[in-house]
Amino acid sequence: MQYTLTRADQEPAPDGASYPLGRRESTSDPMQEQVHRNVFTGKLEDVLNSTVNWGRKHSLWPYNFGLSCCYVEMTTAFTAPHDVARFGSEVIRASPRQADFMVIAGTCFIKMAPVIQQLYDQMLEPKWVISMGSCANSGGMYDIYSVVQGVDKFLPVDVYVPGCPPRPEAFLQGLQLLQDSIQEERRPLSWVVGDQGVYRADMPSQREANRDRRIAVTELRSPDEV
């Protein structure tokens, strides 16, 4: 389990970054190397990882946190017509220490960024972040000094949900993409002090994956049919 400690007198990073973002690099699946080294233990560890990831992705507890109008659409996904309980994410937590993932839903102002960082640091590993809405993704229409131009400037984001605001169905699709990403993760099965060495698969962009289907559409529905 990894804790992020932030000192009050912490010196700024050489590159000007205010948050210790994770370092990413391309690598092969560690399970494949283990299988060639020892077939039995490699397969056993692969099964254990898959089982643990299956339990994690079907019991994601969200943190009750919102910033703007996108939060209204997020809470709508918890109502009966959408039934987010189908995905095991109906248990909303009021404390970040009991939550598994945080949804940044709405406009993130500069004064709010340190608060979001502190709440994120209070979450225990493993933890994930969903950026919901245009304002959280890139600042939206607020290209001004007081709005952070994307929460990925100071937080590691796992899934981006576009829209202004996104519909509840878009949030549910983002939740499913997060589940797919968690299933492919490789994390230590025991307690680890220091770098956890998390392996995450490269997820394809949905914009590129659905490009041919979008181009094939020739007749658009009217607003009252959407």
Swiss-Prot record:
<keyword id="KW-0813">Transport</keyword>
<dbReference type="GO" id="GO:0051539">
    <property type="term" value="F:4 iron, 4 sulfur cluster binding"/>
</dbReference>
<feature type="binding site">
    <location>
        <position position="135"/>
    </location>
    <ligand>
        <name>[4Fe-4S] cluster</name>
    </ligand>
</feature>
<feature type="compositionally biased region" description="Basic and acidic residues">
    <location>
        <begin position="208"/>
        <end position="226"/>
    </location>
</feature>
<feature type="binding site">
    <location>
        <position position="69"/>
    </location>
    <ligand>
        <name>[4Fe-4S] cluster</name>
    </ligand>
</feature>
<feature type="region of interest" description="Disordered">
    <location>
        <begin position="1"/>
        <end position="32"/>
    </location>
</feature>
<protein>
    <recommendedName>
        <fullName>NADH-quinone oxidoreductase subunit B</fullName>
        <ecNumber>7.1.1.-</ecNumber>
    </recommendedName>
</protein>
<keyword id="KW-0520">NAD</keyword>
<comment type="subunit">
    <text>NDH-1 is composed of 14 different subunits. Subunits NuoB, C, D, E, F, and G constitute the peripheral sector of the complex.</text>
</comment>
<dbReference type="GO" id="GO:0005886">
    <property type="term" value="C:plasma membrane"/>
</dbReference>
<dbReference type="GO" id="GO:0045271">
    <property type="term" value="C:respiratory chain complex I"/>
</dbReference>
<keyword id="KW-1278">Translocase</keyword>
<keyword id="KW-0874">Quinone</keyword>
<dbReference type="GO" id="GO:0005506">
    <property type="term" value="F:iron ion binding"/>
</dbReference>
<keyword id="KW-0997">Cell inner membrane</keyword>
<dbReference type="GO" id="GO:0009060">
    <property type="term" value="P:aerobic respiration"/>
</dbReference>
<dbReference type="Pfam" id="PF01058">
    <property type="entry name" value="Oxidored_q6"/>
</dbReference>
<keyword id="KW-1003">Cell membrane</keyword>
<dbReference type="GO" id="GO:0048038">
    <property type="term" value="F:quinone binding"/>
</dbReference>
<keyword id="KW-0479">Metal-binding</keyword>
<dbReference type="InterPro" id="IPR006137">
    <property type="entry name" value="NADH_UbQ_OxRdtase-like_20kDa"/>
</dbReference>
<feature type="binding site">
    <location>
        <position position="164"/>
    </location>
    <ligand>
        <name>[4Fe-4S] cluster</name>
    </ligand>
</feature>
<feature type="region of interest" description="Disordered">
    <location>
        <begin position="204"/>
        <end position="226"/>
    </location>
</feature>
<keyword id="KW-0472">Membrane</keyword>
<comment type="similarity">
    <text>Belongs to the complex I 20 kDa subunit family.</text>
</comment>
<keyword id="KW-0408">Iron</keyword>
<comment type="function">
    <text>NDH-1 shuttles electrons from NADH, via FMN and iron-sulfur (Fe-S) centers, to quinones in the respiratory chain. The immediate electron acceptor for the enzyme in this species is believed to be ubiquinone. Couples the redox reaction to proton translocation (for every two electrons transferred, four hydrogen ions are translocated across the cytoplasmic membrane), and thus conserves the redox energy in a proton gradient.</text>
</comment>
<keyword id="KW-0004">4Fe-4S</keyword>
<dbReference type="GO" id="GO:0050136">
    <property type="term" value="F:NADH:ubiquinone reductase (non-electrogenic) activity"/>
</dbReference>
<dbReference type="GO" id="GO:0015990">
    <property type="term" value="P:electron transport coupled proton transport"/>
</dbReference>
<feature type="binding site">
    <location>
        <position position="70"/>
    </location>
    <ligand>
        <name>[4Fe-4S] cluster</name>
    </ligand>
</feature>
<keyword id="KW-0830">Ubiquinone</keyword>
<keyword id="KW-0411">Iron-sulfur</keyword>
<dbReference type="GO" id="GO:0008137">
    <property type="term" value="F:NADH dehydrogenase (ubiquinone) activity"/>
</dbReference>
<dbReference type="InterPro" id="IPR006138">
    <property type="entry name" value="NADH_UQ_OxRdtase_20Kd_su"/>
</dbReference>
